[in-house]
């Protein structure tokens, strides 16, 4: 039987999920009006910057630490269930790679504006709490949920998306040879079809996670990811078209053959 505290927390986590959707809509609208504040689109006025490798580690850390804390906690009743453990592990694997592997594979990388890094820390803290707390304390699944078609298809999409994301990052890292400083057109993999193959992979990841978790919290995360990364992808696409006359005109922005 749910306690009053448990019911209150479930309502809080649902409210946070809907808030995440609202913020996603605001981010999507803002990205249509102004450029991003980091990477190749950062303005010279952003003088306070953090080294790229350090920024990635610090900003992604909350989404790694919070699930680990829940796994270590003795007061996480839902993690006695296999579906909950697997779903939280999916979240943890992504951020383990993002926090502990990806930054140390980077070659150079422009320093990130402090504002962008701070915003990323806030998001990863809020979302890390939302996803890990929901799966460890609130989400209820049948023991055979891992054989449900929604879970199996979702897990397949998550795994495929993560592999696409990692492979696309590998292609981007290897665009420049030692001593090169300029930008080049990405070739190979899904970059033959879209400008932002790495973003497409990440969106697929979290859509798969949302399907496998079959929750408002998972869906909110996938929705926010699409709102944020689709705007970034559109900026990249327009930038490549301006910079390279030979840029393939048939490439879509982020979804092969569609958008």
UniProtKB/Swiss-Prot annotation:
GO terms for biological process: androgen biosynthetic process; androgen catabolic process; bone development; cell differentiation; cellular response to cAMP; cellular response to dexamethasone stimulus; cellular response to epinephrine stimulus; cellular response to estradiol stimulus. Pfam families: Steroid_dh. Optimally active at alkaline pHs. InterPro entries: 3-oxo-5-alpha-steroid_4-DH, 3-oxo-5_a-steroid_4-DH_C, SRD5A/TECR. GO terms for cellular component: cell body fiber; endoplasmic reticulum membrane; neuronal cell body; perinuclear region of cytoplasm. It is a multi-pass membrane protein. Liver and prostate (at a low level). Keywords: Differentiation, Endoplasmic reticulum, Lipid metabolism, Membrane, Microsome, NADP, Oxidoreductase, Sexual differentiation, Transmembrane, Transmembrane helix. Coiled coil: none annotated. Converts testosterone into 5-alpha-dihydrotestosterone and progesterone or corticosterone into their corresponding 5-alpha-3-oxosteroids. It plays a central role in sexual differentiation and androgen physiology. Belongs to the steroid 5-alpha reductase family. This is 3-oxo-5-alpha-steroid 4-dehydrogenase 1. It comes from Homo sapiens (Human).
